[in-house]
């Protein structure tokens, strides 16, 4: 995702829109400002943050933090920073509020399902049970400066809430640039603030 290839599209009434691919999906952000410089600076700040977020937390990127943690399962803790710790604490909260339904350690289960197979098959009960034995957010050892998965084969996947978290953060970035009217749509996960000029509502579908 190159910044130079994602230019704000100027719409009517001071409304701008940027469209791009990130986080494995199509993204679109609409926002209003009277300043062309603010429109461009917000674009740059947003795309930089999203690119950094994806590089750090995507399990599909070999050198991401999540990939490092997964490779180190059962071997050694992995150092984290304050932003990482904030994200892991959010996982704690979501796991508690959903009574365990939300669990970022379900990667072993995801790995036994081949969703790209021409003829999908259901994993055997023994494979499912074996994968379940490596699942459990409560087993994750989270410290202020490191995180550790205690058993080899355990794995994290932030796909269940990564885009939602990113939507909230991009909305905060907009506010930091003085933008009070915006719609952030990252692959169907949407948040709005304010409203477009000349109308009271954002169109989401």
Q: How should these model regions be labeled?
A:
Residues 1-205:
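Mature catalytic core of soluble alpha/beta enzymes
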């Amino acid at each position: 995702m190159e910044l130079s290839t994602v230019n704000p599209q100027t719409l009517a009434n001071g409304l701008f829109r940027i469209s791009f691919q990130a986080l494995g999906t199509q993204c679109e952000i609409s926002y209003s400002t009277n300043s062309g410089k603010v429109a461009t600076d917000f674009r740059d700040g947003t795309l930089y943050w999203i690119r950094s977020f994806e590089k750090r937390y995507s399990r599909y990127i070999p050198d991401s933090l999540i990939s490092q943690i997964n490779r180190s399962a059962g071997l050694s803790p992995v150092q984290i920073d304050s932003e990482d710790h904030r994200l892991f604490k959010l996982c704690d909260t979501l796991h508690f509020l959903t009574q365990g339904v939300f669990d970022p350690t379900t990667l072993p289960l995801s790995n036994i399902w081949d969703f790209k197979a021409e003829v999908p098959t259901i994993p055997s009960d023994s494979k499912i049970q074996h994968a379940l034995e490596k699942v459990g957010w409560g087993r994750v050892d989270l410290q202020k400066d490191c995180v550790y998965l205690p058993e080899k084969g355990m794995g994290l996947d932030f796909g269940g809430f990564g885009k939602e978290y990113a939507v909230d953060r991009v909305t905060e970035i907009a506010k930091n640039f003085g933008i009070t009217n915006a719609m952030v749509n990252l692959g169907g996960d949407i948040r709005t603030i304010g409203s477009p000029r000349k109308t009271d509502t954002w169109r989401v579908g």
